[in-house]
């Protein structure tokens, strides 16, 4: 179906109607960018017409109006003021829209007829580099995806940071995991069918002609862009799918940016085996930087991020989403953090970094020649800090810190250039003048003196004219439209001297010009124009000079970013009482007094620490206990401790010894602070299936309440089968939380079979009168009660409903046994069972009596037990 814009243009082309010259100009520009919103410059506004106007009015909540008519019909129109357009542009980009900026070319006042207009810039969600359009603590990525019969090729670029990377994956699941990790703002895909469901409806997806995703074409494009003869230096010579994606991305960038991209100097191949794998579900369940409800507060990143600079914050986020398996790299990071703590140098670095600014993105704008005056002053101030940073680092005995010290480089000449060339506090825009410092250029200083002396000349002229004319209220002034003038009120206008020439008539005054004032105006305005022109020339010279230093400056910015992250790790370790983890070669996961970093940070009460001990002969813990008892928190805290250790951070534990880990996989459908009943049984089984197919003996797996989304017996059977598969086939490290107490018998089976791979632990609660107190301490062995009814009462269920539930529980316990036993035998269910919903004793009263521990019962519990026993007789 054609858009209204296209129909209107077609009418014009067919000759059925005739459009105004302005609308013809609009349609000509719009025809080149039919899928983009066109910001059409008209004086002090960017106007949008037809469908663009309707869409912008809806998205931006601005007024939709009409601008006369063209082609025999009213023209829908909406607009935003030029002085405030960046705010509107940022909102559109955040919504996944792309915008073409069509500017007026030349001076409208000098144009004969219709002023010329031209699209000078295209802004898309993945290609923005303007500071006002970017989230300073999050990468803005453009990604392209190609596919072949063997899998998918990915290429992504951070244009604002100057990074360009590629990867190849072998499945749609792996593709989804990468997209979840990188969160691209814009995604380029071939316009073909049969793409995975998770791409449908995603914001920012751009369908492009399939021929753009060709491996041979991509290779030629990359060779031409980087001016190379082969791609072997980048490690992608044998990666045709990734090469195809990279070529498609590069073509899109060149098409939209309309300029060279000198800051993209290389392309890197990510190696999947170097990082711990986490699928999309795991990232969601662990709430690394966003909670499952979409909130960004109370996340791991929120607790961990103590970086001072925006570029440090972005690097930390990248590290958090790609924990490394490279032991030597991690040991160097841990050692660097410890060295900073021991020397007390982290505080000194962080204090120095507070004046640093976002050098990484500033250097990109320098490379693209879009840097603003205050980018120069920020870069100047940042480079001026380098001697202090080098002094702090010089005595520190840490291999990584000394490597970063060397990567800072020597930039004294560049710093001196900026100190001498840039004003202390430059204006926001070059066109305002005053960017170049006084004393840097003699010609500019002379032109400025002419402008400066003009103020005194005008004061003297005003006094002389008042005296000679006898008009005490006479004023000398200036405006941009009419230039300099002598203003006399209407009541005094008849006293104007004969040599005054009228320049402008106002409601209450007349404005005049004299030969002397005209001569002065020509001289001063010429000086100001020449001054601005000279400043622009000098400004371009600064960009040229900095352009030759970009590589070294980018390395320096990268080193400063990492120092910021490491200093932040040191600050967090001391403030939160975290310890240095130990990375072992042997398979193990031993954590002493571990805590959940986020829960501990937000809770007012002290956090109950817990231990974890997994190794070759003890790979699975079956975790039982009451709802709200802390099972999910315990599981996730151990996963987060492992993750923190693998980004180079200290960890919330008194000691952590961690063997090789290749994956963290989770299935958490409901629980403490998780999605409230939104998981479906199909999602549960799909995520479980992924884990069973991908977990290895070096994987850490969290399974929370498997089987609760279906019937009791189906759920129990599935939970039993999944646990057995993980323990005996995958043989991974597994934390298996369940409300099926029958599964605790798996540990007994394991011991009986001579393989002690499964153990039971539980979290308990204690009743004090009407109150239920959760202990949050992990203890050996299975739980002996579920406290389900007590938790229901705590949740606010009416007392009548709870009472009815108690009666129903007794009935089910009395009647529910035989069919249950028949269905599940012989399984873990043959072992002694908890007295509860799924019990199947041959003698219910006898079994219930054996389950009682008189020393543990409160008077109220004893009375309830007596009533239950009586009902079973």
Swiss-Prot record:
Species: Xanthomonas euvesicatoria pv. vesicatoria (strain 85-10) (Xanthomonas campestris pv. vesicatoria)
Residues at which ATP binds: 625-632
HAMAP family per UniProt: MutS
GO terms for cellular component: cytosol
UniProt superkingdom: Bacteria
Name the UniProt record assigns to this protein: DNA mismatch repair protein MutS
One of the protein's GO biological processes: mismatch repair
SMART domains: MUTSac (SM00534), MUTSd (SM00533)
Pfam families attached to this UniProt entry: MutS_I, MutS_II, MutS_III, MutS_IV, MutS_V
Family from the record: Belongs to the DNA mismatch repair MutS family.
Keyword terms: ATP-binding, DNA damage, DNA repair, DNA-binding, Nucleotide-binding
Source taxonomy: Bacteria, Pseudomonadati, Pseudomonadota, Gammaproteobacteria, Lysobacterales
PANTHER family hit by this protein: DNA MISMATCH REPAIR PROTEIN MSH1, MITOCHONDRIAL, DNA MISMATCH REPAIR PROTEIN MUTS FAMILY MEMBER
SUPFAM superfamilies listed in its UniProt record: DNA repair protein MutS, domain I, DNA repair protein MutS, domain II, DNA repair protein MutS, domain III, P-loop containing nucleoside triphosphate hydrolases
Gene3D superfamilies: 1.10.1420.10, 6.10.140.430, DNA repair protein MutS, domain I, MutS, connector domain, P-loop containing nucleotide triphosphate hydrolases
GO MF terms held by the record: ATP binding; ATP-dependent DNA damage sensor activity; damaged DNA binding; mismatched DNA binding
Role played: This protein is involved in the repair of mismatches in DNA. It is possible that it carries out the mismatch recognition step. This protein has a weak ATPase activity.
NCBIfam families tied to this protein: mutS1 (TIGR01070), PRK05399.1 (NF003810)
């Amino acid at each position: 179906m054609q858009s209204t814009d296209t129909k209107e243009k077609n009418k014009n082309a067919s000759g059925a109607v005739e459009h105004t010259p302005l609308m013809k100009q609009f349609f000509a520009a719009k025809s080149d960018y039919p899928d983009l919103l066109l910001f059409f410059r008209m004086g002090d506004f960017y106007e949008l017409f037809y469908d663009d106007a309707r869409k912008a009015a809806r998205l931006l909540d601005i007024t939709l109006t009409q601008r006369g008519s063209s082609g025999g019909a009213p023209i829908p129109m909406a607009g935003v003021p030029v002085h405030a357009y960046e705010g509107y542009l940022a909102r559109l980009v955040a919504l996944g829209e792309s915008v073409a900026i069509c500017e007026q070319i030349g001076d409208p006042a000098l144009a004969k007829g219709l002023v010329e207009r031209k699209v000078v810039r295209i802004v898309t969600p993945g290609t923005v580099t303007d500071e006002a359009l970017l989230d300073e603590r999050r990468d803005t990525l453009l990604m392209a995806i190609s596919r072949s019969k063997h899998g998918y090729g990915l290429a992504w670029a951070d244009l604002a940071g100057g990074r360009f990377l590629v990867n190849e994956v072998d499945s749609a699941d792996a593709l989804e995991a990468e997209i979840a990790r990188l969160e691209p703002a814009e995604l380029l895909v071939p316009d073909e069918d049969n793409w995975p469901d998770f791409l449908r409806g995603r914001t920012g997806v751009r369908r492009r002609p399939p021929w753009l995703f060709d491996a041979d074409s991509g290779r030629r494009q990359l060779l031409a862009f980087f001016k190379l003869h082969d791609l072997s230096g980048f490690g992608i010579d044998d990666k045709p799918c990734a090469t195809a994606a990279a070529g498609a991305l590069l073509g899109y960038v060149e098409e939209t940016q309309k300029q060279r991209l000198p800051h993209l100097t290389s392309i890197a191949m990510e190696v999947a085996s170097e990082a711990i794998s986490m699928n999309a579900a795991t990232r969601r369940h662990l709430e690394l930087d966003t909670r499952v409800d979409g909130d960004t507060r109370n996340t791991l990143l929120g607790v961990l991020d103590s970086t001072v600079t925006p570029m440090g914050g972005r690097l930390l986020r990248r590290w958090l989403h790609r924990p490394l398996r490279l032991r030597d790299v991690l040991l160097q990071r841990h050692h660097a953090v410890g060295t900073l703590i021991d020397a007390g140098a982290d505080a000194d670095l962080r204090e120095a970094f507070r004046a640093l600014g976002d050098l990484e993105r500033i250097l990109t704008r320098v490379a693209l020649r879009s840097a603003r005056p205050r980018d120069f002053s920020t870069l100047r101030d940042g480079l001026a800090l380098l001697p202090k940073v080098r002094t702090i680092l010089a005595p520190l005995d840490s291999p990584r810190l000394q490597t970063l010290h060397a990567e800072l480089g020597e930039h004294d000449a560049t710093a001196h250039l900026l100190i001498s060339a840039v004003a202390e506090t430059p204006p926001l825009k070059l066109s305002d003048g005053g960017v170049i410092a006084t004393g840097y250029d003699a010609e500019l200083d002379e032109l400025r003196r002419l402008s400066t002396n003009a103020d005194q000349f005008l004061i003297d002229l005003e006094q002389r004219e008042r005296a000679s004319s006898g008009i005490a209220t006479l004023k000398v002034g200036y405006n941009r439209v009419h230039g300099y003038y002598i203003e006399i009120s209407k009541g005094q206008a008849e006293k104007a001297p004969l040599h005054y020439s009228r320049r402008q008539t106002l409601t209450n005054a007349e404005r005049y010009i004299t030969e002397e004032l005209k001569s002065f105006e020509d001289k001063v305005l010429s000086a100001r124009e020449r001054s601005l022109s000279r400043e622009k020339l000098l400004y371009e010279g600064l960009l040229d000079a900095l352009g030759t230093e970009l590589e070294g400056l980018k390395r320096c910015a990268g080193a400063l970013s990492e120092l910021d992250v490491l200093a932040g790790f040191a600050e967090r370790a001391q403030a939160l009482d975290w310890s240095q983890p130990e990375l072992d070669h042997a398979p193990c996961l031993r954590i002493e007094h571990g805590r959940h970093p986020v829960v501990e940070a937000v809770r007012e009460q002290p956090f109950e620490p817990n231990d974890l001990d997994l190794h070759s002969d003890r790979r699975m813990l079956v975790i039982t206990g009451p709802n709200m008892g802390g099972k999910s928190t315990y599981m996730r805290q151990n996963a987060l401790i492992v993750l923190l250790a693998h980004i180079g951070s200290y960890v919330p534990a008194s000691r952590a010894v961690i063997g090789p880990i290749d994956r963290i996989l989770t299935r958490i459908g409901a629980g403490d602070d998780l999605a409230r009943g939104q998981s479906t049984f199909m999602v549960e089984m799909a995520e479980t299936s992924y884990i069973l197919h991908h977990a290895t003996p070096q994987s850490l797996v969290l399974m929370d309440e498997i089987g609760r989304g279906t019937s009791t017996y189906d759920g129990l059977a599935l939970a039993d089968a999944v646990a057995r598969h993980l323990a005996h086939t995958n043989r991974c490290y597994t934390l298996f939380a369940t409300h099926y107490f029958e599964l605790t018998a798996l540990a007994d089976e394991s011991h009986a079979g001579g393989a002690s791979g499964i153990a039971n632990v539980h979290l308990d609660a204690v009743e004090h009168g009407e109150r239920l107190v959760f202990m949050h301490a992990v203890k050996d062995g299975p739980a002996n009660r579920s406290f389900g009814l007590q938790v229901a009462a705590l949740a606010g269920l009416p007392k009548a409903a709870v009472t009815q539930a108690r009666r129903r529980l007794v009935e089910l316990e009395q009647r529910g046994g035989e069919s249950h036993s028949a269905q599940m035998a012989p399984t873990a269910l043959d072992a002694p069972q908890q007295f509860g919903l799924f019990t199947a004793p041959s003698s219910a009263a006898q079994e219930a009596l054996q389950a009682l521990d008189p020393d543990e019962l409160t008077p109220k519990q004893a009375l309830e037990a007596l009533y239950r026993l009586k009902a079973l007789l």
